Amino acid sequence: MKKIITILMLILSTLSFATKKLYVGTNAEFKPYEYLENNKMVGFDIELMELLGKELGYEIKWQDMSFDALLPALQMKKIDAVIAGMSATPEREKAVSFSIPYIFFEGGHDVIVNDKSSFKKKEYLKGKTVGVQLGSIQEEFAKDNGSIPKLYNNFTEALLDLQNQKIDAVIIAEVSGKEYLKTMKGIKKIDTIKDKLPNTSIAFRKADTKLAKEFSNTILKIKNSPEYAKLVKKYFPEHYDNFITNLKKN
């Protein structure tokens, strides 16, 4: 009888582990990090989180919402984690905790203007209106540059206003700016705001220190793996060599 009970407990334990779910929030409007393709969520963050979840035994359940709603949803326990190309800024760290960074290559941020604009570099934009996504790190860059940030729910809205000359410029992560420059007419890049290794991390509730540690340890485990390298090459091919160089340094 004891043997049967032990076997049943093992089966139930295995089933429980196999079906544990993690509800993860993202904003699928930030190519190549996360975006919709044929009504399916794809991107670097999406595949990376699925890989991390697999390593830890989680089934990832995705929740798509506006960028500025992500951290409030996390705090209200509507989701368990956030991955959305989000930087772990000091201001955000007051409200939530973060994993270690999961991006291991240097980046930057494009300064984009209307193609009829006479602006030639970011310094020309002091006192000018610059479109940024609500809650994004680009808002800080705009302020640091002496510009007046105008907040948008997403970069598509900001760039449409730029096309129509309703704002003077948009600041956007270069990997995403590159995608918009390919497909949108009437805009051009004039400058880049350089960034060191971005502090791009996964957000968790303050109380979920164990969960944050689990994911941090797993990021360290997979960063040297062929799977991670393939994701970098797939979504950030222009940064692949830089990624390899940084791995050798570490």
Regions found by a protein language model. Give the residues of each.
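Short helix-initiation/N-cap motifs at beta->coil->alpha
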Residues: 61-74, 134-135, 150-164, 196-198
